Regions:
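Generic alpha-helical transmembrane segments of integral inner-membrane proteins
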Residues: 25, 29, 33, 37, ...
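Small-residue-rich hydrophobic transmembrane alpha-helices
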Residues: 50-110, 114, 147-166, 258, ...
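Alpha-helical transmembrane segments of multi-pass membrane transporters/permeases
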Residues: 101, 156-183, 200, 204, ...
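Hydrophobic faces of transmembrane alpha-helices in multi-pass small-molecule transporters and flippases
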Residues: 9-29, 137-141, 164-171, 213, ...
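Helix-terminus/linker motif at the lipid-water interface of multi-pass membrane proteins
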Residues: 33-51, 120-127, 183-193, 253-286
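Short alpha-helical transmembrane segments in multi-pass integral membrane proteins
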Residues: 1-21, 78-145, 191-246
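Signature of the first transmembrane helix
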Residues: 15-75, 79, 246-266
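Hydrophobic residues within alpha-helical transmembrane segments
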Residues: 22, 26, 56-59, 99-103, ...
Length: 294
């Protein structure tokens, strides 16, 4: 029995809640940072670039919402199995978590390749804004698999009571993004100047870095073991996962749907209105995302 599990089994509820709630709250706060960090730097490229990121924000948050929904479900089922001292079942559920995370990643690859332009055409006909939005959105959605797999592994860590590693991983991803954003957006001495595309690339590299570290640390430190060799999906486990993941994902995605609807209304006013509303909502996300961590 490891230290985290022993703590979960025997420590008083309130101190345990405080010890376990703060790291995931910080982690969820950092999870909402990608588009916000990008927007800070992209704003220097002009209003049209900032508007493009505001249009991409709901779709980016939607992918995050369903990733978190899947992670919450995996977390709950693993914790239940560990509570029953059934480590073999916990491992099997973890296998399903990684398997479904890969399938979700393929779905977002399809969305990123084929649905970007139709989606953004609902909100703007400005060719510059449309080009920026498609460029940024296509990159961050098509290559979001790093974020999806990372979040799934993060929730597996949390299911065993380990709250610090997920927070550390989110912090590393954010730091990489912050460092690379100005370099890849504005370039250095005329090199690596990619503009809006650079913001998206920096985000993806940050996510991939966190994902790679998550895989390494999970393999080395977690009591849960994942192996897709000879893996056979179990319909009942998948049903149990989605019975939690779908409601959780839908609830978490509602703000993103609201933003998309409001963007469609603001588009009839001006592109500036979309840009300003995007800034407001990104700041607001710093309030409700930590609550999801609790």
């Amino acid at each position: 029995m490891n230290q985290e599990y022993d703590m979960m089994a025997h420590k008083p509820i309130f101190p345990l809640l405080m010890k376990m709630a703060i790291p995931p709250m910080i982690s969820m706060l950092i999870q909402s940072k990608d588009n916000i960090i990008d927007s800070i730097f992209v704003a220097k490229l002009g209003e049209e670039a900032l508007t493009a990121l505001s249009l991409a924000f709901p779709l980016q948050n939607l992918s995050l919402a369903f990733s978190v929904g899947l992670g919450v479900a995996i977390n709950a089922l693993i914790a239940k199995s560990l509570g029953a001292s059934d480590e073999k079942q916990a491992n099997y559920i973890s296998d399903h978590g990684i398997f479904l995370a890969i399938l979700h990643s393929l779905l977002f690859v399809f969305i990123g390749i084929f649905l970007m332009k139709p989606f953004f055409l609902m909100f703007t006909t400005n060719p510059t804004v449309l080009d920026y939005a498609i460029t940024y959105g296509s990159i961050v959605i098509t290559f979001t698999f790093g974020s999806i797999i990372h979040i799934t592994i993060e929730k597996m860590f949390q299911a065993t009571g380990n709250m610090m590693i997920p927070m550390f991983l989110q912090g590393i991803g954010a730091i990489v993004n912050i460092i690379l954003d100005p370099i890849l957006i504005f370039g250095i001495n005329g090199y690596l100047e990619f503009g809006v595309a650079g913001a998206a690339i920096a985000t993806i590299i940050g996510q991939m870095t966190a994902c790679l570290l998550a895989i390494i640390l999970f393999r080395k430190t977690s009591r849960i073991k994942v192996s897709l060799k000879n893996f056979k999906p179990n319909a009942q486990i998948i049903k149990n996962i989605y019975s939690i993941a779908i409601p959780s994902g839908v609830m978490t995605s509602l703000p993103s749907i609201l933003v998309a609807l409001l963007n469609s209304l603001l588009a009839t006013v001006s592109q500036t209105a979309i840009a300003f509303f995007g800034i407001y909502f990104k700041l607001q996300s710093f309030i409700y995302m930590p609550a999801n961590g609790l």
